[in-house]
């Protein structure tokens, strides 16, 4: 599991006015909650978070939150509020992580070997990814940044379901998996070719 460190400082002033001043200074108001400790208000460097939030790992990995240069606190991102039209993160929520408590996290799917699969090499075939992430349950030490889905054997007309995915050791789906809930993940089918537009009325009639 990769180590992703985020620097933070404790926040003394709270409220809308204080948050507005922080944003003007290039900082983001944030909070840490959960576990057996009280919530802690913190502030983050906007540039660091703006760059981090462009990566998958920021949403699905355990983050090492370094507050005031002290020991890192293990957290998960639980909410990130963006400005509706400006490139601005408004607020961030982190949840504390306990090493012996299972997590429920949405983990991205990475599809490999699609281009070299029978369906990928066939002409006139459309391959659609119905899901791009799955909700999994696991201990923090077992949390993967992503799960690979091998499409090397994908054929035209085939459907890959959740039950076909191989999950890492210690990782399982958060929801029940049965016939009714075994969702399609990848579908490979022939492209639909539309007929030419019908001839206009009277076209081709003899005069």
From Swiss-Prot:
GO aspect biological process, one term: translation
Disulfide partners: none
Any one cellular-component term (Gene Ontology): cytosolic large ribosomal subunit
InterPro entries: Rbsml_bL25/Gln-tRNA_synth_N, Ribosomal_bL25/Gln-tRNA_synth, Ribosomal_bL25_b-dom, Ribosomal_bL25_C, Ribosomal_bL25_long, Ribosomal_bL25_short, Ribosomal_L25_dom, Ribosomal_uL5_bac-type
GO molecular function, one term: structural constituent of ribosome
Stretch list, region Disordered: 1-20
Keywords: Ribonucleoprotein, Ribosomal protein, RNA-binding, rRNA-binding
Pfam family, one: Ribosomal_L25p
Annotated function: This is one of the proteins that binds to the 5S RNA in the ribosome where it forms part of the central protuberance.
Quaternary organization: Part of the 50S ribosomal subunit; part of the 5S rRNA/L5/L18/L25 subcomplex. Contacts the 5S rRNA. Binds to the 5S rRNA independently of L5 and L18.
HAMAP family: Ribosomal_bL25 (MF_01336), Ribosomal_bL25_CTC (MF_01334)
NCBIfam families from the UniProt entry: bL25_bact_ctc, PRK05618.1-2, PRK05618.1-5, PRK05943.1
Membership in a protein family: Belongs to the bacterial ribosomal protein bL25 family. CTC subfamily.
Name recorded for this polypeptide: Large ribosomal subunit protein bL25
Lineage: Bacteria, Pseudomonadati, Pseudomonadota, Gammaproteobacteria, Lysobacterales
């Amino acid at each position: 599991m990769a180590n992703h460190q985020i620097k933070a400082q404790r926040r003394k002033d709270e409220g809308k006015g204080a948050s507005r001043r922080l944003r003007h200074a290039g900082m983001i108001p944030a909070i840490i909650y959960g576990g057996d400790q009280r919530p802690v208000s913190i502030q983050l460097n906007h540039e660091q978070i703006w760059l981090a939030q462009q990566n998958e790992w920021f949403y699905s990995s355990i983050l090492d939150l370094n507050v005031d240069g002290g020991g890192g606190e293990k957290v998960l991102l639980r909410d990130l509020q963006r400005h509706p039209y400006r490139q601005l993160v408004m607020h961030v929520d982190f949840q504390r992580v306990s090493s012996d408590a299972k997590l429920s996290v949405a983990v991205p799917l990475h599809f490999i070997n699609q281009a070299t699969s029978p369906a990928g090499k066939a002409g006139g075939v459309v391959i659609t990814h119905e899901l791009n992430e799955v909700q999994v349950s696991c201990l923090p030490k077992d949390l993967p940044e992503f799960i690979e889905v091998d499409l090397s054997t994908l054929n035209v007309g085939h459907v890959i379901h959740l039950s076909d995915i191989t999950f890492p050791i210690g990782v399982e789906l958060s929801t029940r998996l049965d016939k009714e809930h075994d969702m399609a993940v990848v579908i490979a089918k022939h492209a639909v070719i539309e007929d030419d537009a019908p001839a206009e009325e009277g076209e081709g009639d003899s005069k």
